[in-house]
């Protein structure tokens, strides 16, 4: 993965998405290009070298956040793509609560209430098992 290109695209997307006159369509393009570049761990062949772990984690966190931001932007237009992005995030990090909320909203837009509720229940179980905590208030509010 070209980490510099990935980060540059995310930065451009952030600049386009914010500001007095957001350019959402262009931001979506930058985020989508960045997500397409992310294929997993940074320098996987050097996984056990200490110097790569902080950078690997930083890039992964940036990628997961970018996938959720992109999913949020795409939600009104293509809820199925938003759902796919949420599921990709959860496959990498099953405790990423923002991805559960995105998944719940995508299912709700598709009028698939049972799956939205199931997503919440999975979130509750995973967070309890991993950390012994309940979901954030905004997650519970979305459920209710």
What are these language model-derived features?
Residues 1-144:
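Intrinsically disordered, charged and Pro/Gly-enriched terminal/linker segments
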């Amino acid at each position: 993965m070209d980490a510099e290109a990935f980060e540059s695209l995310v930065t451009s997307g952030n600049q386009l998405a914010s500001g007095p006159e957001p350019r959402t369509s262009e931001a979506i393009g930058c985020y989508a290009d960045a997500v397409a570049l992310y294929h997993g761990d940074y320098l996987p062949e050097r996984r056990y070298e200490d110097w790569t772990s902080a950078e690997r984690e930083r890039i992964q966190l940036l990628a997961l956040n970018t996938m959720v931001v992109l999913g949020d932007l795409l939600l009104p237009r293509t809820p199925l793509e938003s759902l796919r992005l949420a599921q990709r995030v959860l496959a990498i990090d099953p405790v990423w609560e923002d991805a559960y909320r995105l998944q719940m909203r995508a299912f709700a837009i598709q009028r698939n209430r049972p799956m939205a509720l199931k997503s919440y229940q999975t979130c509750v179980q995973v967070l309890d098992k991993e950390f012994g905590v309940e979901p954030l208030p905004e997650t519970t509010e979305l459920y209710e």
